[in-house]
Curated annotation (Swiss-Prot):
The gene is Prrt3. It is a multi-pass membrane protein. It is found in: Membrane. Residues 28-467, 513-532, 582-588, 650-669 are extracellular. This is Proline-rich transmembrane protein 3.
Amino acid sequence: MAPSPQACTSPLLLLLLPCLGAGPALGRGLPRPLENSEPHMIPSESQTFDLFWEKLRNESSWHSGDPQARAEGPKKPADPYLGPALHGPKAAPGVQGERLLRADDLQLARAFTSQGWTGPPDSQELLEPEAPEPHPVRAPRLTLVTTTPSSLLSAAILSTASQKPGGTAGQQPARNEELIMVKAETHITQASPWDFQGSSHTPVPETDAVRTLVLGKQGGHEQGFQEAVQGPLLTQQDPVVPGVGSTPPVKVESTPEPGAQLDLALVRSLPLPEGLPAEPPKTGAGDTWEVSSLGPQPEQTDLLGGQDSPAPQPIPPSASDTSDGHLRPVSSLNGADPISPQRVRGAMEAPGTPKSFIPDLPNSAQAANGTESPVRALQPDEAEDWPGRPQSHPPAPPVQAPSTSRRGLVRVTTQRALGQPLPPEPSASSIVPIPASSPPANATAPPLRWGPLRRVLSFSWELHVYGVGVLFLLPALLALVTVAAALAGPRLALVAAALVLVASGLRSAYMLTDPYGSQARLGVRAGLVLYNLPFPLLLTALAALTLLGLGAGLPQPLQKPLLLGIVAPVHGTCLLATDLFSTSPVLNLLTQGLSCAWGASVALGTLCLCRRRLLEGPRGWDASPGPRLLAVAGSLGLLASGLQLAASLWLYPGPGREGRFSWAWWGVHFWLRLLELTWALALALAALAATRPRPPTEHACWAKLLRLACPAPTGKSEVPERPNNCYAGPSGLGTGGLDISKSLIRNAAGEAGLPVTPGSGPWGSAASLGRGRPGGQRMSRGSVGPAPSLSELDLRPPSPINLSRSIDAALFREHLVRESVFQRCGLRGLASSPTGGALRPRRGSQPDAELDGAGTSLLRGRCRSLTEVCLRTSLPQHVMEPPVGAAAAGTSGSSLDSFSKGSLKISWNPWRHGLSSVDSLPLDELPSTVQLLPPPTPVPAPARAGEPQGEGQSRCKSSESHSASSDTIEL
């Protein structure tokens, strides 16, 4: 069919619209139906409109000056399968296309709507290049970006002749140019080159702006063509340069902006990178340049249209490509780094439009507020993604274009074509922002929910929640064992163990059920109760154990457990009431402050009492473990009180802290849980130590083990290394309890006819170690009295021989002294009747150990009075002078007292002077005690026989203290 010289592509588009059907994309941004808009060209500023259209298949070029050409349109049947891209760069050699020259603000960005090259055409399409295979008609996807009733819709396909290797024809000087290209995504069955006829073109301004109309459908089938409605163009015909390689098409598209005036899509041809060699086009890969412009454009131009051709249109090379003498195809950018963003002057934006430099998806829904959502652009080293595609690395986070007040941003990137189309990208409003490693505690921080907290804290979150929940079961189990095994123990210890059990169970249930309200399983009030209740329970347990172990150091009013029983319920009730019924955060914070102050006071008091006990008591580790455990528990309670107050700031509403994550929140709660866990363990151990029975001083089993491990050497008695007389009891101790006389060497009573002395019996030896009162209370064998002091102990060791008998046998012979020096029988015989007499008690002997009647008669028969020896000789007058006054009447008492008080000093030796009897002794060498003896005077007999004995006993008691002085005996 021969085309009319005046036809343009606008009628062709209008004819295609009814066939394609009106979709939801047609009515978007249209103030009235599309058929009401009439394509027209309005001249302005007295400029001539010249349209030069290239002829298809050896036809002459069309001129836009004929007004009749508008009514006619090309009757070429269009392929019903229209798509946004061609099946590959298969451009035939042709002429160099027109240049579009204009300086403006542009943004070249690779949008997510372009599906790129769909790969090389299949074998069936290559075998049938002449006629397209019929396919069932499907409703194509039609995307129409903004238009107005006066908008002008036309299509222009600009092609450039590809350059042969080594060719230098068709070079143009470098200049600022703008390209509007159409990227067709359908493989055209006819492959014939364009024939361009050169002629100069003039600027064709236009009054209204136009937008890009994209006709196509989704899928991998053959697709139609894509036409772009273009703005102000400055065209220039270039000479035909045959070339071997072909360049991929470039898609021109403008972003929709509701409410703004229609603007022109203008593309500035950017120079290619220098130094890149030209390479032949690849069938299965290509580079796609998509250009989007922002804001309304101040200029309007006419459109150059061309009839669709079976081959894609080549792109005119830029001025930088021709500067080195030959043309470079755009396909040489395959695999090259993207061009860095460039800013271009002159871009304008309509007031009130959002400043987004990345174009929106044509098929994506607008946001609720009408603003455009920024879409992530693929990086140069990042391949396109689609559902089901295996990924070797995690996807990169979305890159959002910064909002700036600058006029425009040009971003040029290259894209490797893949065999699969891109899926529609979700809008940025549905993407949850992932916080950085240190997110601020504000509205942008993630909420306190399980998912965001798990993403931020990774495995630390689950380790904290489940670890603390399980570890709190340990003090609960220990407290349960304490309560069950020691029901008969102290009540305060059992109460403390029960409180630790309840507090540990509540904390474990809170962490395993709904930690910090992150899973919303519990209500707000129930969560507050479970969070705050363990603190007063543990604090009450600490106070109970302190009162039990260290209550003696407290004042008397504070030692009553009833006071603790009143304060503890009031503390817990106030916290529960404010958490359940209070609606004022100030009241809740005030209650928490008072609770923490009370906890700090109890902990400090415990520490002070422990310090006093440890300083005053024994310092051994095993002496008193109670104060040390309580000191550890008090320190942990003091720290927990401070952190509990800090954590309460996140429990109630606050500026910028309600339900938001922050690293301060995480640090406070992490350390508070650890302190509570250690505190509960210390209290459980202290309660267990208080309820267990006290071990004996020496455990029987332990003693057996020590004897087996360290046996004593043979032949060594296990007598303790201490004085053996220190076992003597106090003054009231009898012979039954501590009788050590069995281990002493003693003479038998009455041996060799000797008299029985008080020290020779069993009690005599025991009494010499510990003196007791006559008739004193006797203790039982198993009873233990208080230890005697050093002043009461007689540290003299017990004598292995009977010294009294030895001294009497050595000194006092029959011819010297007929009686013992240590007995009073001879002296009593002088002052009393022969029937009455008593023995003088030895120092340290038992006072009531007196001789009975038989013993007295026996001793009296054998004893001779010392006065008998003295009276046989002549004594001086002063010696024989009787006492005066009352002394004569009480001769017996005064003489005995003076004899007892006097010091017995025996200093003479009869055999030293060669004397054989006392008669030969001089008077000056007689014993000094003889001078104290009064002359014998008659004494009336006592009324009763037992009276002298009692009188002598009383005298012995009175003279006991005076006889404590040592007697000197010089041999």
